[in-house]
Amino acid sequence: MSMSDQKNWHMMVLANPMVSLLILGSVIGAILVEISYPLPEYLLYSGLEQGQYLRLITPIFLHFGLMHLAFNSIWLAMLGSTIEQQQGSIHLLLLVVACGAVSNMVQFNWSGSMYFGGMSGVIYALLGYLWVRHKLRPASYAPLPNGIMLFMVGWLLFCMTGVLELALGIAVANAAHLSGLISGLVLGVMFAFIGPKKSSD
């Protein structure tokens, strides 16, 4: 890596500290999955009745394989950095915690299994949040690149058919993805109307 590349990475981390911490957490989660399988219970989802509220969130950091980690990290860097630079690190963290908890709870109650993980539910939440914020208040966020929303919703619907699981044995947390998207849309609508308006709105 050249000096200019190192400088660019350093500047990116400084500009997006929360995104960087979330990606670091995902890397650590992926390593723990690799070295601790079967996964220790404290990393997995636990319902509210257990009183261990942190475990409502911890599954978002668990990733199963390099592709799973890389795919989610790229999307998180792209979508999360947009929100963090526009509204700050705390705002992004609150979105991640709220939507992560919702998507994890829905996935657990839908599947009945606590053996799931990944940042994908949060990714769909951030996608929905950015999309609806731009639609309702265009001055607050730039539009998503052409075709991204269509591609991601199409991928969600394709995964829900069960083809991947039947053909490749890849289990997909469809309930987490769908509930993440919906929660992001809902929060996007809420913040579009309660946030400070710009003169160009």
Label the predicted regions:
Residues 2-201:
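A detector for small-residue-rich transmembrane helices and their helix-helix packing motifs
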